[in-house]
Amino acid sequence: MRMNFSTMATAGLLLAALVTTTPRARAFDGNEDGEDDNKSYAIGLWGDLPYSAGQAIGVKNLIADMNAQRLAFTAHDGDLKAGSTVCLDTVYTDALGYFNSLKAPAAFTPGDNDWTDCDRTAGYSSLAQLDHERLLFFNTSYTLGQKKLRQDVQATPLCLGFGGTSVPCVENRRWTYGKVTYVTLNIQGSCNNLCDTLPDAAEFAARNAANIAWMKLAFSEAKKNRSSAVMIISQGNPGFDATDSTRGPVRNATTLAEANAATDGFKEFLLALRAEVAAFAKPVSYVHGDSHYFRVDKPFLNATGQRLENFTRVETFGDNQQNGNNDVNWVKVFVDPNSREVFAYQPQIVPANRTAVPLP
């Protein structure tokens, strides 16, 4: 439980840290050693891990597998634990250890299990936990990892912290690597904090507005910089159509209306995203976790029912223990700024984690 500090002090600490902290590892902007912006590279995506002690062992194997490959950076799309377990300090310190054991820069965006759902345990505050994550994982303008990557930060105090005071949305990041713009957004499962144990409409409204503004700015910067593509990384599955029922909201694909409008924490964002995707006209990849179901598809339609061909949804592997398969694996993305689609996706089944079908 972390309710013994003022949110205003937290905001000040965050802003001061972003200005004054020097990363311990070497940092760089975009491409390493002056590499050509047009050069192809690969990144690693993972999330919704670990949910158990067994998966924690699998995560170490996953990290070793990532470290054995040449990656420009990695990104974890949130959920460091199961939603039903207590938000103990060790959850976050263990995660920090995982991220900093990665050789490549390690980007991260929080998950609902990390903060939104923490109030399922008496005495725990969702916003106190989010404040703790902001201080632990986002106290500089760089990624985590043994090598650091410089990021732009949404430092304007648009979000809410513990006590309801406005604080910087420092978890929202943006960076450019090889002519591609990347952006993280604090978008959550549990109806984006509008359902579950203690819904918080005020917190949602502030963060939702901040997310939309940060997303729009990312597309504006991508256009200004003539980026070849945009990749958005968040936790929650917003639901894109009537078939997306695997823990995601089911909605009308053209109106984007959800059946239960009272707890729809995504429609306003999706409407804004759809407009930006159409206007950008170049490849857009939307990476999320939440549903624990690896997939790459094109579920986004415009208001007249036409598919937005330049939009691809990527859901990373995640906890799948209920089906007897832990799915402690990751997704390798090949990025070629000069190719037509820019992104190519390849699931990586970690050899040391194979149990159902062991290696021959």
Locate each region found by the language model:
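C-terminal segment of classical bacterial N-terminal signal peptides
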Residues: L18-R24
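Active-site glycine-centered loops adjacent to acidic/histidine catalytic or metal-binding residues
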Residues: D48, G78-D79, G111-D112, Q235, ...
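Extended active-site neighborhood of metal-dependent phosphoesterases/phosphodiesterases
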Residues: V86, T90-A210, W214, Y293-V296, ...
